[in-house]
Amino acid sequence: MNYRYIYLIKKWPYSGFGEDFDSKFRYNTWTLCNFLSRHVRKLHLPTDGDYNLLSCAITKEKDHVRVCSVNCLDVSLHVSDSEIQRYLAMRSEQERFEFYFSLLERGYRLAALSHSVPIDDFLRLHQQFRDLGYRNEWLFKKVMLREHGIKIILEHVLTQYEYN
């Protein structure tokens, strides 16, 4: 199997940091997870098991790695209350994305202790997201209506707050 999805989520059903935090964290990481998942598929990076999803979940519990269900390598990342308070105090999107990247990198390194994880390839995807200005945009479709002389370009823009 190949890696097809990279997620940064809160531990299911609750992270231990409160429902309000859990909901906002999920929405704030959505754009990054979508970007990483769309781009990791193009790389055709093989896994060492029957999973195609690398899920890094924040929690108050201890760090651990396990293969769960049929297709998921689940990495639980212990995050302290002080890290959460620092995160909540961040005002810029760039700071938040860098915090997400640091969590993902911790997850990759933890998973790599017991599984084959292409850390360098994943880190290149992080850099690609930075180089694009922390934006998740892509061309959806181009259509030419020759009889009207119109060229239509449809682009997707996914931010932490909306999807257009």
Per-region residue spans from a language model:
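Eukaryotic low-complexity, non-globular regulatory regions
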Residues: 1-114, 119-120
